[in-house]
């Protein structure tokens, strides 16, 4: 599958990654809430999408550490809230944050943050003092799995 066809804008506020079997919210918390979020806010953001049944689904969650980097490609660029390049596919909405929060590290009071300007991970101290953005995701069958 060519990289050009990997991400599909579903026209319902979601983007499907056909290679990884993931459906992403097209916007992030910065687009939707107009503010930075801490870990609790990001979990609440995903929960609110479930309560609204965003795009007809109620299994939205924060991405894992590994899932965070799957939407990053240095050759792609759209503008973040500050007019700087973030390296995600053009199917995603511009104007969002430049970092994404992952789900909490199991058994620890920490999380991963992925910078979509630089492609680098960080594991900052303090779940409740973070100031990042969140993007929700859900797992779907891969296109190849449906055949």
Each predicted region: which residue ranges?
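Residue-identity detector for threonine
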Residues: 14-18, 27, 64, 70, ...
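Extracellular adhesion/carbohydrate-recognition regions
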Residues: 1-55, 60, 131-137, 144
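Disulfide-stabilized, aromatic/cysteine-rich ligand-recognition loop
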Residues: 115-147
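An exposed tryptophan-centered "aromatic clamp" motif
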Residues: 43, 47-57, 65-117
